[in-house]
Amino acid sequence: MVHLTPEEKNAVTALWGKVNVDEVGGEALGRLLVVYPWTQRFFDSFGDLSSPAAVMGNPKVKAHGKKVLGAFSDGLNHLDNLKGTFAQLSELHCDKLHVDPENFKLLGNVLVCVLAHHFGKEFTPQVQAAYQKVVAGVANALAHKYH
């Protein structure tokens, strides 16, 4: 559960309504793979990840980034039940994919950076603070099934 004030919730949903999920998702996942290259090991089937340009232009990275942001969008609609919303994804990433849950925090922080880049002055410190709460809540929910 994420505790947002009504103002924070409005800020999050208002900005999210302007997000191009295809573009932002691919950029966020791509930046994660470039900035934290050890995360690439989970994406062996994605082909060429040999350089920042290859990662950022990789269609599989873009497609998976869109999928990730689709799940994030779903979470925004269920802020009162993030653990339930992300239960299956948590189990998948824990039991089958063996993803270090710290990576969820990294991706959340990268997403905040990408949003700041895309929205500039509209991404005020108050909006950032609200999004930091949301990405922390999502990361916590995704780590929930870990032992």
Swiss-Prot record:
Belongs to the globin family. Heme b binds at H64, H93. This is Hemoglobin subunit beta. The keyword Iron applies. Signal peptide: none annotated. GO terms for molecular function: haptoglobin binding; heme binding; hemoglobin alpha binding; metal ion binding; organic acid binding; oxygen binding; oxygen carrier activity; peroxidase activity. The modification N6-acetyllysine is found at K60, K83, K145. The modification N-acetylvaline is found at V2. Residues 3-147 form the Globin domain. Keywords: Acetylation, Heme, Iron, Metal-binding, Oxygen transport, Phosphoprotein, S-nitrosylation, Transport. SUPFAM superfamilies: Globin-like. The modification S-nitrosocysteine is found at C94. Heterotetramer of two alpha chains and two beta chains. It comes from Papio anubis (Olive baboon).
